[in-house]
Amino acid sequence: MSNLNDKIYDVFIAGGGINGVGVARDAAGRGYSVCLCEMNDFASGTSSSSTKLIHGGLRYLEHYKFRLVQESLKEREILLNMAPHIIWPMRFILPHTKGMRPRWFLRLGLAIYDHLGYRKILPGTSNVNFANQKTNSPLKDTFKSGFEYSDCWVDDSRLVILNAVDAASKGASLRNYTKVTNATSSNGLW
């Protein structure tokens, strides 16, 4: 588009998924002039095909990524507070059998997950006894006990759009169906 060449932006972003619009929102909120181009519609790619989970990264505990888990749990709580209309708490059941890691080990991991989190809204982890489960349960009879923990579900496309709307309200120029085909440097500018 010819009018893109008429203005020099502080920040130019190619891609209108959650990362692109999130950066646009943050940069525009800090007073930078921002232009974002997306070759299709906003949230039309990976951002609308996610697992739809806002999770704390429970599996990263196994690799001792405590800081990453703590940061993820903190951000999960912030997002849940900011957008309860598109992010909902969700309880997960983790059945346990003897062939898995020791029960005490899993419980320890979940206790660490609780400890690292900044939970003010979500309930903590708990033990679950399936011995009294009703017939027609989706669980196999081999599952006698397990654990329950919380994470969140998000309307991922809506999260992208809300970030895009906020970025635009802060002055960002957002252009969907605008493909970036080339970028060159001239006099220290792109």
Regions found by a protein language model. Give the residues of each.
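Glycine-rich FAD pyrophosphate-binding loop
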Residues: 28-48
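Beta1/beta-strand and adjacent pyrophosphate-binding region of the FAD-binding site
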Residues: 4-19
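Helical element adjacent to the flavin cofactor pocket in flavoenzyme catalytic cores
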Residues: 147-190
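Dinucleotide-binding Rossmann-like beta1-alpha1 core, especially the glycine-rich loop
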Residues: 52-136
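Short amphipathic alpha-helical face segments that pack within enzyme cores
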Residues: 22, 55-56, 158, 162
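Gly/Ala-rich phosphate-binding loop of Rossmann-like dinucleotide-binding domains
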Residues: 24, 28, 166-168
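Short linear elements at protein peripheries
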Residues: 113-165
